[in-house]
Amino acid sequence: MPKINGNEIRPGNVLEHNGGLWAAVKVDHVKPGKGGAFAQVELRNLRNGSKLNERFRSADKVERVRLEQKDQQFLYESDGMLVFMDAETYEQIELPADLLGERRPFLQDGMTILVEFYESEALNATLPQKVTCKIVETEPVVKGQTAANSFKPAVLDNGVKVMVPPFVGQDEMIVVNTETMEYSERA
């Protein structure tokens, strides 16, 4: 595994640090008036989700880990485990449902997601950035309601509540950004 200097750490890098695998969530490069430059890094443990703030000097060396990325197709859920199939090898794997966190409701049958592996252990799963959902409940459209930046609550077919523009009505299909969990556009 390649070693990188502390000032080369970027958000999204996976590092081996203190015997664990950590993802750099936020990186601030600081150059104080006195003393050497350093990187203040917010790390998230890929195995248990705990967070850690660490300071790396420019001269510090850290192990950067490359994760293998594979597309996996969602098949079904069983006993809190999500079952996926590798599209190339047709091999099935089970992942804990909490691996997707609050984005779990956006997972749909047959959806292809990106799973990151380290030495055949699944560490992270990423949904597509945009997903199409149906609005099952929202307030009716009121004509003449054109106040700037006004949004109304809506409940999607997966139970998630999002804010939508006033012109969007019930039973309409919309596109939701899975990273921000916000309305993106009409489908």
From Swiss-Prot:
It is found in: Cytoplasm. Transmembrane segments: none annotated. One of its GO terms (cellular component) is cytoplasm. GO terms for biological process: peptide biosynthetic process. It comes from the Bacteria. Keywords: Cytoplasm, Elongation factor, Protein biosynthesis. Pathway: Protein biosynthesis; polypeptide chain elongation. SMART domains: EFP (SM01185), Elong-fact-P_C (SM00841). GO terms for molecular function: translation elongation factor activity. CDD domains: S1_EF-P_repeat_1, S1_EF-P_repeat_2. Belongs to the elongation factor P family. PANTHER family: ELONGATION FACTOR P, TRANSLATION ELONGATION FACTOR KOW-LIKE DOMAIN-CONTAINING PROTEIN. Involved in peptide bond synthesis. Stimulates efficient translation and peptide-bond synthesis on native or reconstituted 70S ribosomes in vitro. Probably functions indirectly by altering the affinity of the ribosome for aminoacyl-tRNA, thus increasing their reactivity as acceptors for peptidyl transferase. This is Elongation factor P. It comes from Ruegeria pomeroyi (strain ATCC 700808 / DSM 15171 / DSS-3).
